[in-house]
Structure formats: structure tokens, C-alpha cells
């Protein structure tokens, strides 16, 4: 998988893979669950906008991330704060290994 770590307009980190589609989200969530095991929890929000975006909130060590897909970024893992930035960087190290 060709994951790219970028800084988005909010100043936070996002891992993006333009080659993956929305139907790859379950496989990525499974990969995250395998890696983080008991540290990963599901969040409260899941959203779908037909044909243009899909997203799910997850928590790892209580830190909120969004795993989603849209027609601009492809599949992404998005941070919401500085703790999330560090976590996205941790994910990038194992997901690109």
C-alpha cells in the first residue's frame, strides 16, 4: 500500500492512500485492530455521504482518529489534535513497513 503522511489545512496529520477505495476501510480497521489490540475502541460516529465520502471514528488510547474515504484523498487516517498527530505518525511507521 502506498500511504503518504501529509499535513492537512487544520495543521494536523493525515495518512492517505489514493489507491484504496471505500470498501478497503474494513481491512484497514482490521489491520489497526490487530496492531493496537485492546488499545483500540470504536467511536460514536459513522457517516456516509453517498458517492463522495465515508468515515468512522475510532479511539486508540482514548485519542480520536477518523478512518475514512473521500473522492479527494482516497482512504485516510486523520488526526484531530497533537496526540492524534503522534499516533498517526506511529501508524505510518508500521503500515508502511
Pin down the residues of each PLM region.
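Negatively charged, low-complexity tracts enriched in Asp/Glu with abundant Ser/Thr
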Residues: 1-49
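A generic structural signal for beta-strand entry/edge sites
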Residues: 12-14, 53-55, 74-75
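Short, compact, well-ordered microdomains
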Residues: 57-97
